[in-house]
Amino acid sequence: MMKIKKLALLCVMGICSQNLSAAEMAKNATDITASANQSVLKQLPFNDKQDFDDASRGFIATQTPLTIRDAQGNISWDLSDYGFLKGAAPATVNPSLWRNAQLNMNNGLFKVTDGLYQVRGYDLSNMTIIEGKTGLIIIDPLVTTEVAKAALDLYYQNRPHRPVVAVIYTHSHADHYGGVKGVVTEQQVASGQVTVLAPTGFMDAAVSENVLAGNAMSRRTLYQYGAMLPKSPLGQVDAGIGKTTSEGTFTLIAPTDTITRDKEQRVIDGVTMEFQLAPGTEAPAEMLIWLPQFKTLDVAEDAIHSLHNLYTLRGAEVRDASNWWKTLNQSIENYGSRAEIVIAQHQWPVWGQTRIVDFLSGQRDMYKFIHDRSLNLANKGLTMDEVAESVKLPDSLALKWANRGYYGSVSHDAKAVYQRYIGWYSSNPADLNPLPPVEAAKQYVDYMGGADNVLAKARLSFAKGEYRWVAQVLKQVVFADPQNKDARELQADAFEQLGYQSENPTWRNEYLMGAYELRNGIPDLPPISTTSRDMIKAMTPELLLDYMGVRLNTDKANGQHIRLNWQQPGGQQYTIELNNSVIIYEANKQFSDADATLKMDTLSFAKLVMGPTTMRASILKESSTITGDKVKINQLIDMLDNFPGMFNIVTP
């Protein structure tokens, strides 16, 4: 996932107050959409109920209703909103998506095998609990502390109350570590009572991924997860690999032990583990875990009951499909003949050696097919969009439920392969330096005979069910004149039908969020922070200085020259120089003629440059921490932009 880069948790932070109006404005499926969705029932093996058996197998207990609140009474997690997910799919939801959404409703404590349990449906991700000789080993403590604590409490209500002795992060996405302080304290880790284990590169990946482009990712995450949509057959029904993400307190405790070599082993509280490193697959830092005494392979998030993202719609660096299939192939080679259970940190397990190999090889072959076929077509001269339109999985892969596109899609994953190897440019000079969207839109509309003419033709296309084209052509009218209510309404209607037909819930959410904002405008919400106190504490000085450079308003900085020294208590030193409208820094160096010198740790420096004005004023008053010209420091910080949280997407 999902994954803080997006902080998945940020997509739903108290911003659903407008859901009622969204539900009231939503329209029903057209006859064309209803027919398209009905046809899906004939295309896929709906008689295969194995996933339903597996998803409910080993169920012990759950909380009813599953509503989790924080200390102030605010809701952190609530599955009761999804009570509508019963019976057959309505016309407004693709039946394949409806099936997956029902499967993801399985929630509670599940016994996987003796000594191995999972809590599912308490967040987007799963918490895996291993019973050691004296205590518990927690794998991936969910997104927020509130749900992580509730998940552990559920376990304790049904199993012996033993202390947590270790926490393992399988990878660097927020839904796999953010709730850590709900199961252990920082003091327990610092004292050595609890080990925190992670793959090499975890901290750098977990922090950096959410900082430099964090604001843009957070805004786009609202679209990917359908944050403003009501949970209903007309709105958000699922997130593909879970229902949605929890709201609450996001935390991070740094690892005390790191896996640096493939097949490295640990014995934790009597439990032997072997780790398969998988960097650059689903996350920059990731690992799979072989548990020989349980004959169980934890595949982290590299094999789930869906095609995963090679590119995530909220935005991120594209992932390496070649590395991904090779990782799964190595898993089959290493453990396929020994594994009797496969678990993942999303969704439900697979039991039985034959089924496991079939599941893993199906996932492996899917990623390799998308990789190879996309490049095959690119080498024949097809552009990115043409590649995405042309790549189709063979039925031997496409008819496996675990290979359906509930998170990634063949279309946008094929584009990711193209992007990774070739990039954005089609090589057609017409695409080299096109007019920007608004200017081009005005020209398009003028060439097409004006907005009224375009709208008249778009209405005819809508009536024929040509929703993709209607959405595409009306973008020009909306960008040429965002006040054109008729264009906005018709484009919203087209988005809506596309959403209703989408098998992929993230596509559905994207379309329905676009329709929502065309009809309602952009909600007036405060900027969404992508950093918590724990995240800021984990930032390296270099990352913090890089982020300053990203925030620099180059117009304000034009012609300015400022030189600062930064000295940390541990002896680290940096120079910071503003010149030519860029911030350049160097480690292990000091200016002899600096305008000012700051003597403070990274957290204090972060408060100075990222905190509110009142906090800055308080820090600047401390003569013991800053010497020299404080005006220069103020001038530099005043040049740093505070990014708008809710920038335009479907309008210019």
What is the predicted role of each segment?
Residues 22, 460, 466-472, 479, ...:
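Feature captures hydrophobic
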Residues 25-37, 41, 296, 306, ...:
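Divalent-metal (often Zn2+) His-rich catalytic cores of metallo-beta-lactamase-fold enzymes
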Residues 111, 135-136, 143-145, 197, 203-279, 323-332, ...:
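Metallo-beta-lactamase
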Residues 102-162, 287-291, 295-301:
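Conserved beta-strand hairpin/beta-sheet module of binuclear metal-dependent hydrolase folds
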Residues 1-23:
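Gram-negative bacterial Sec-dependent N-terminal signal peptides
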Residues 134-135, 145-195:
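Active-site metal-binding motif and surrounding structural segment of the metallo-beta-lactamase
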